[in-house]
A protein has these predicted regions:
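Short, surface-exposed beta-strand/strand-loop-strand elements in extracellular ectodomains
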Residues: 91-105
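Short, Φ-rich (hydrophobic/aromatic) sequence segments
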Residues: 12, 73-75, 115
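Gram-negative bacterial Sec-dependent N-terminal signal peptides
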Residues: 1-19
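N-terminal small/polar-rich segments of proteins
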Residues: 18-94, 124-165
Length: 165
């Protein structure tokens, strides 16, 4: 009897199965990168207005998109519609803005501006050609009903996204 128990134990140990989890990993690096090539600056052309236009004393920000694979990404750029920091404001701000293609690295990108889609404070471009595209972003903020803006620093942010198609 003892021999048969030992024999059965040896057989069971020889036929035991062991499970192993073996992971498969991978890293994906984006083929679309976004850079601020020039930081924007608000000019103050009148007591109730801030503007990035050069004629108003401002500096237009320039955002660059670098795409290494065509037809896989959409650029979504949103001009500001609020201040991320400012002095205390007691009235509303009327926001306006515009996003435009200012330069491209490839002649095949010439149609980007005509094909852009605009809604609310957002502008989208289908990035159909690999290379670099530079966008300028106009921003204007008008305070209240003929009220002067309080003195201090005003900061507003452009949101630039690369959306995978």
């Amino acid at each position: 009897m003892f021999k048969s128990i030992t024999f059965m134990s040896a057989i069971l140990m020889a036929t035991s199965a062991f499970a192993v989890d073996s992971p498969i990993t991978g890293n994906v690096s984006s083929k679309c990168s976004i850079f601020t090539d020039k930081a924007g600056v608000y000019g103050n052309p009148s007591p109730d207005e801030l503007s990035t236009l050069a004629a108003d004393g401002g500096v237009l920000p320039i955002i660059r998109y670098d795409v290494s694979i065509a037809d896989y990404y959409t650029a979504k750029i949103s001009w500001p519609n609020s201040f991320s920091s400012s002095p205390t404001l007691t009235d509303s701000i009327a926001w306006d803005g515009e996003v435009s293609v200012s330069s491209t690295s490839d002649a095949g990108m010439a149609g980007y501006e005509a094909a852009k889609v605009e809604y609310d404070n957002h502008t989208e471009y289908d990035l159909t050609v690999a290379g670099s595209t530079w966008f300028t972003v106009e921003s204007e903020a008008v305070y209240g009903q003929d009220k002067s803006l309080p003195g201090g620093e005003y900061v507003a942010n452009i949101v630039a996204e690369c959306i995978a198609d």
